[in-house]
Amino acid sequence: MNYLPIFIDIKQKPCLVVGGGDIAYRKINFLLKAHGQVTCIAKSSCKNVVKLASDNKIIYFEKSFEASDIKEQVLIVSATDNTSLNKQVSELSNQNNIPVNVVDSPDLCTFIMPSIVDRSPIVIAISSAGKAPVLARLIRAKLESTLPHAYGKLAELAGNFRDKVKEKFSNIEDRRYFWEKTFSGIIAEKVFSGKIQEAKADLQVQLDGSTKTQVGEVYLVGGGPGDPDLLTFKALRLMQQADVVLYDRLVSNGVMGLVRRDAQLIYVGKERDNHVVPQGDINQLLVNLAKQGRRVCRLKGGDPFIFGRGGEEIETLAENGISFQVVPGITAASGCSTYSGIPLTHRDYSQSCRFVTGHLKDGSMNLPWHELSVEQQTIVFYMALNGARHLSEQLITHGMSPDMPVALVEKGTTPEQKVYTTTLKKLPDLVKNEIIHAPTLIIIGEVVTLREKLNWFDAKLASSKKSYLFGG
């Protein structure tokens, strides 16, 4: 280890930055975040540094650096492109035992500034000892994507209870166990979702040692259209901490591969007219599992609030006083159209887009066909594969051109994606003659013609058999 990683308190203490360019500006902001009193010396400065000075956030001297400028400083940063000046600042700082950092010159530094992940009061510093700063920034980016921004609030909550916990548990091992349970459980998740007061109350109950079973929480998570890379950070985090996962047929294998390894998996798959577990039973199962104190992830394909019956499920949770979170997912219409090179709206072809279910609650397709048949719009049908003939006939009957372009996207966003293009008139024959598997989305509109020009995903697939043209 070439450097000792330490954190220095510079609150209200004088810090000097030599230089006024963009890099100096970044270093000044770094020092200001730690509440240092910053003085900047430069013969000329960028507009951002000048603004900091005009806002009285720093002291600014537009002049050349002099040896006397380092007097009474507790920390110095030199951020200029003048090699001899940087060396002078370093030597003077060393002679006066003042910590100094010279940007991009590790040999002239007595300390280096790491990349940081700021979740104050939690701060993570990453350093490559000046060897590979770009790599340090990449590592920082990975950490930024995995650590919830509310970690700081969790630390503050813990700080408020620290003395109480110390008083309750004299043994350090008992305290450690208490905090580990807190930081990895429902209390932490409530903080992350902004329910600070609930988390505070639950922490007090846990500290009091109540024997009452703590009610768990349900996470209604949108698993997206199939590609696991399209999951949100929050979705992934909740999937990996849930005790139980209820999932359905539309969740891809790639997404399922990311759930917590030891979680209990319950399949509640749904197919047309064949629900493995009836919706009412799913609703009640969510309630029962949460009342057992378990963290329950209800994992759905696409977005839970777009033809996903998510509203019905959380209605039941709300009626039973169960805490829940809803995490949006990329809906199939957005994911499948994007991965097929078909924009849902376009200035020249479509000024609106409608998402329509082809499988209504009563099993019929009682839709406003006149509204759906107007020009300059895109229609996306979910769950309509078996009703393709009916929707084709109805749209043509109500005025849509029989030659209107149509695309069917099977298993969209996955390596198994297939895209069939045809016309509205020929759609029934396509579905009849080809072996097309659910989940398949039907996109109708002039925007489909753009696929030939804008298709990008199929070109990345190894096989050329992923795209099909039916009926010329």
From Swiss-Prot:
Alphabetical list of NCBIfam families matching this protein: cobA_cysG_Cterm (TIGR01469), cysG_Nterm (TIGR01470), PRK06136.1 (NF004790), PRK10637.1 (NF007922)
Positions that bind NAD(+): 22-23, 43-44
Isomerase is among the record's keywords: no
Binding residue positions for S-adenosyl-L-methionine: 225, 301-303, 306, 331-332, 383, 412
Residue ranges of the region described as Uroporphyrinogen-III C-methyltransferase: 216-472
Active site: 248 (proton acceptor), 270 (proton donor)
Disulfides per UniProt: none
Protein name, UniProt field: Siroheme synthase
Record family assignment: In the N-terminal section; belongs to the precorrin-2 dehydrogenase / sirohydrochlorin ferrochelatase family.
Native organism: Ruthia magnifica subsp. Calyptogena magnifica
Protein task: Then it catalyzes the NAD-dependent ring dehydrogenation of precorrin-2 to yield sirohydrochlorin. Finally, it catalyzes the ferrochelation of sirohydrochlorin to yield siroheme.
One GO-annotated biological process of the protein: methylation
Record-listed E.C. numbers: 2.1.1.107, 1.3.1.76, 4.99.1.4
Molecular function GO terms recorded: NAD binding; precorrin-2 dehydrogenase activity; sirohydrochlorin ferrochelatase activity; uroporphyrin-III C-methyltransferase activity
Keywords: Cobalamin biosynthesis, Lyase, Methyltransferase, Multifunctional enzyme, NAD, Oxidoreductase, Phosphoprotein, Porphyrin biosynthesis, S-adenosyl-L-methionine, Transferase
Catalytically driven reaction(s): uroporphyrinogen III + 2 S-adenosyl-L-methionine = precorrin-2 + 2 S-adenosyl-L-homocysteine + H(+); precorrin-2 + NAD(+) = sirohydrochlorin + NADH + 2 H(+); siroheme + 2 H(+) = sirohydrochlorin + Fe(2+)
Xref: Pfam families: CysG_dimeriser, NAD_binding_7, Sirohm_synth_M, TP_methylase
